[in-house]
Amino acid sequence: VLKDNKGKMLLLDAGIPIMKIKKGCSWKVSDIVGCVITHKHRDHSEAVSDLEEMGIPVYKPYEDNSYIGGYGEFKIVSVPMNDVHGRFKHTDADGTECPCYGFIIEHPEMGRMLYITDTEFVRWRFKDINHILVSCNYQKKYISEDVTGKRLHVIKGHMELETCAGFIEANTTNALQNVIICHLSANNAAPKEMVTRIKKVAGMANVDVAE
């Protein structure tokens, strides 16, 4: 959740039950100005229908990528997480492409934030970004060779630490204040090691792990 000084909130994905969202917002659902959804998978979109039934606008660029401008004082621009051929690397269970989008979110109190999750890489470069919230799912050294398909599931459509570090380095400027990594694999990531690695390429920015 992004919350401004007036108490207005923008939800970043909605992959938990609606009651947890309400509780997390201290039941002040009327202060939710909107929600952005990166892709259709349930762990990012579970509460979409509930939010829409409550009259809360939900931006789903994977269904309709028309420019919306933003919600409240939050200006929003979507960015497709595809390769140079237009293909999305994130997939559904059957292996078909799952369109996934990142977002540039701007607010007078915050500046410009980049939110990206569930992608193997980001081919874009961005200017004047103040905050980056990005998924850094796993470290190659912790991925064990197996034949169960779990290894492929972890790798497919998710970002490895060194790839993430390269992305951060390419987008680090004097404007960057914070880097927050999220969506860490429970069994294939060491948070402290990840933070240490990202700090080496993030300039003077603060680096932390999302709770």
Walk through the language-model features, giving the residues of each.
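Conserved beta-strand hairpin/beta-sheet module of binuclear metal-dependent hydrolase folds
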Residues: 1-25, 99-118, 131
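A general structural motif
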Residues: 7, 29-32, 55, 110, ...
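Active-site metal-binding motif and surrounding structural segment of the metallo-beta-lactamase
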Residues: 8, 17-61
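Active-site metal-binding loops of divalent metal-dependent hydrolases
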Residues: 14-16, 40, 63, 81-83, ...
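Glycine/Thr-rich phosphate-binding loops of Rossmann-like dinucleotide-binding domains
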Residues: 20, 45-46, 123, 141-142, ...
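Metallo-beta-lactamase
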Residues: 50-110
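Cap/insert and terminal regions of metallo-dependent hydrolase folds
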Residues: 126-210
